Amino acid sequence: MTEFTHINSNGEANMVDVSNKRETVREARAEAFVSMSAETLAMIVSGEHHKGDVFATARIAGIQAAKRTWELIPLCHPLLLSKVEVKLTALLDTNQVRIESLCKLTGKTGVEMEALTAASVAALTIYDMCKAVQKDMVISNVRLLEKTGGKSGHFKVE
């Protein structure tokens, strides 16, 4: 079994030393879902939400969150991201919004946490903007879809 990289021999949490790692192109994709009523989703899709463009706000929030992941997750490195993309899709058949994020850089450590943070914060932003009309929305299935680059290689959800 692979060992935890953020825990030293004394069991203490530490930031991983990436000084001697080589730079590679690294990319990660993550997703999250927000389930809601058909009425709430229709309000978002039609642009009739009183707070404005929910998708645009969630997209910007997700991008901003990816850039600030190192401030939110204690042992994450500050990264110079070369690309952050957040796509939101209304799934009318299931009354959900699907959020997919992509983060990319050339660096010494991966961008999985940045992609997961982008998707999560975009989902939280949708909840925040819509909670006045529906409080029982559900954020679910936040997960890493794919990552490339680095020593551990390629991972993709089956």
From Swiss-Prot:
<dbReference type="GO" id="GO:0061799">
    <property type="term" value="F:cyclic pyranopterin monophosphate synthase activity"/>
</dbReference>
<comment type="subunit">
    <text>Homohexamer; trimer of dimers.</text>
</comment>
<dbReference type="GO" id="GO:0061798">
    <property type="term" value="F:GTP 3',8'-cyclase activity"/>
</dbReference>
<feature type="binding site">
    <location>
        <begin position="113"/>
        <end position="114"/>
    </location>
    <ligand>
        <name>substrate</name>
    </ligand>
</feature>
<feature type="active site">
    <location>
        <position position="128"/>
    </location>
</feature>
<keyword id="KW-0456">Lyase</keyword>
<comment type="pathway">
    <text>Cofactor biosynthesis; molybdopterin biosynthesis.</text>
</comment>
<protein>
    <recommendedName>
        <fullName>Cyclic pyranopterin monophosphate synthase</fullName>
        <ecNumber>4.6.1.17</ecNumber>
    </recommendedName>
</protein>
<dbReference type="InterPro" id="IPR047594">
    <property type="entry name" value="MoaC_bact/euk"/>
</dbReference>
<dbReference type="InterPro" id="IPR002820">
    <property type="entry name" value="Mopterin_CF_biosynth-C_dom"/>
</dbReference>
<dbReference type="InterPro" id="IPR050105">
    <property type="entry name" value="MoCo_biosynth_MoaA/MoaC"/>
</dbReference>
<dbReference type="InterPro" id="IPR023045">
    <property type="entry name" value="MoaC"/>
</dbReference>
<keyword id="KW-0501">Molybdenum cofactor biosynthesis</keyword>
<dbReference type="InterPro" id="IPR036522">
    <property type="entry name" value="MoaC_sf"/>
</dbReference>
<comment type="similarity">
    <text>Belongs to the MoaC family.</text>
</comment>
<comment type="function">
    <text>Catalyzes the conversion of (8S)-3',8-cyclo-7,8-dihydroguanosine 5'-triphosphate to cyclic pyranopterin monophosphate (cPMP).</text>
</comment>
<dbReference type="GO" id="GO:0006777">
    <property type="term" value="P:Mo-molybdopterin cofactor biosynthetic process"/>
</dbReference>
<dbReference type="Pfam" id="PF01967">
    <property type="entry name" value="MoaC"/>
</dbReference>
<feature type="binding site">
    <location>
        <begin position="75"/>
        <end position="77"/>
    </location>
    <ligand>
        <name>substrate</name>
    </ligand>
</feature>
